[in-house]
């Protein structure tokens, strides 16, 4: 399978947001039911600001999962799903049933197992989920999803979703897609904004 890498630099957040929204428009047109994985953090505000004003965006048939998720109640501002839900569902842009979520009431190991089961149901017939598009952030330390530099989870190859209970960045308990799942996606976009990310990108 051939692969290519493209680096795009945008002079403003507005232009970055517009580019991401157009990517989602294009992916929606090319996919029969877009299978999308999203990250949280600053990406939530960026996408939730841009998507409602994207006229050509058709979210019908979308299924939206998360590249990682913090083990907190959905009402907590730290919940990635909670933030997307609060910003997008009331606008009618997407329905709650289109999201694939963790169960934050479970212990972190069980939450990872439960999320694995849900992803296997979404990608029936595939041992390894193959997302159409993953949109990931990058932290100042270089972490993406909840995969942190030097952490043992980087070596995990036998799981779809892994639990983490010692995240260097709070909250400590999270679940995350593993590197094999990220690498298997059709398209992966890494979004980095602000001066704090410049050093790690260089």
Q: What do the predicted segments below correspond to?
A:
Residues 112-113, 145-150, 200-202:
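A short secondary-structure junction signal
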Residues 50-59, 82, 86, 149-158:
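A glycine- and small-aliphatic-rich helix-loop capping segment at beta-alpha/alpha-beta transitions
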Residues 1-4, 59-135:
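Ligand-binding beta-strand-loop-alpha-helix segment within the catalytic cores
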Residues 30-55:
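Glycine-rich N-terminal segment of FAD-binding domains in flavoprotein oxidoreductases
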Residues 180, 184-202:
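ATP/nucleoside-binding phosphotransfer catalytic cores, i.e., glycine-rich phosphate-binding loops
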């Amino acid at each position: 399978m051939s692969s290519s890498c493209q680096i795009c630099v945008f002079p403003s957040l507005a232009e970055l947001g517009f580019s991401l929204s157009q990517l989602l428009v294009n992916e929606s047109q090319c996919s029969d039911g877009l299978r999308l994985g999203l990250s949280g953090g600053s990406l939530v505000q960026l996408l939730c600001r841009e998507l409602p004003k994207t006229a050509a965006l058709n979210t019908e048939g979308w299924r939206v999962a998360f590249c990682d998720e913090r083990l907190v109640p959905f009402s907590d501002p730290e919940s990635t799903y909670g933030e997307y839900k609060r910003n997008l569902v009331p606008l009618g842009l997407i329905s709650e049933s289109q999201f694939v979520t963790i169960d934050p009431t479970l212990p972190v190991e069980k939450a990872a197992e439960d999320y694995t089961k849900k992803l296997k149901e979404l990608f029936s017939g595939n041992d390894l989920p193959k997302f159409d598009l993953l949109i990931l952030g990058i932290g100042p330390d270089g972490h993406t999803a909840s995969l942190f530099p030097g952490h043992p989870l980087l070596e995990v190859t036998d799981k779809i979703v892994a639990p983490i209970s010692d995240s260097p960045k709070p909250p400590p308990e999270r679940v995350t897609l593993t590197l094999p799942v990220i690498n298997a996606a059709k398209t992966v976009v890494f979004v980095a904004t602000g001066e704090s990310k410049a050093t790690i990108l260089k």
